[in-house]
């Protein structure tokens, strides 16, 4: 667990790339006015199975190993009369990189957003978090 619950930014983008021997998944945020200059609260962990949130149904994500990332952010703006989606990008990526095979949104409920990452095998990874992004870097399988 890392980051601060006091910083709940807008969730705006997901980038998935493989470059220089590293498969990278980046979640991007827009800070809200007055928010502290710290990363949003997040949890990143290996899990045996990915499930949808909040239903708990099994998620069909390709892979032999799975990483779940949960972060506090707004994917929908509820401040007006009608809800407005903030994150309007894809909910699923199937890059089939050497290590990262699939990235899929598992849930977006009450400012808690979860995504699953399917890997070709269990691999050590690095997490880099700033107020405007959380990046997971996996060495490309050889």
Report each predicted region and the residues it spans:
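Short linear recognition/processing motifs and adjacent strand/loop elements at protein termini
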Residues: 1-142
């Amino acid at each position: 667990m890392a980051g601060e619950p006091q910083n709940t930014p807008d969730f705006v983008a997901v980038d998935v790339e493989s470059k220089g021997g590293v498969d990278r998944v980046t979640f991007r945020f827009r800070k809200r006015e007055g928010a502290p200059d710290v990363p949003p609260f997040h949890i990143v962990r290996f899990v045996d199975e990915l499930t949808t949130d909040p239903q708990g149904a099994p998620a069909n994500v390709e892979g032999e190993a799975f990483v779940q990332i949960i972060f506090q952010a707004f994917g929908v703006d509820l401040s007006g009369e009608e809800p407005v989606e903030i994150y309007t990008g894809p909910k699923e990526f199937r890059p089939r990189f050497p290590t990262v095979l699939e990235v899929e949104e598992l849930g977006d409920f009450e400012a808690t957003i979860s995504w699953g990452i399917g890997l070709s095998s269990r691999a050590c990874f690095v997490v880099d978090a700033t107020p405007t992004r959380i990046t997971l870097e996996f060495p490309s399988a050889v």
